[in-house]
Amino acid sequence: MINTQNFIYTAETTPDLSTNLSNSVSKIDPLVGLADAVNITDSPNCNTKLSSILSAAEIKKKGLDVILQLTGRDRNRIALESEMLGALSIDVNK
């Protein structure tokens, strides 16, 4: 859990366009122990990528906090609410 009393270090990653989750998540291995959290982008530049929620869940297993991005550009309110419920159901909430 991020300590709000100190300066925090974050990094950003973009999931791959691949079904190989371990390759996408292994990019952050060097950050474990260095970064406090990882910001996970959500299909930047209108490009299809692996789910940011799925990537966030796997990164949390490595002991890093995640900052999940959800873009509203290609989703309506119901789709965004479904994404948030999915994230909460797999403990991507802090």
Where are these regions (language model features)?
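Domain-level signal for soluble alpha/beta catalytic cores
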Residues: 1-94
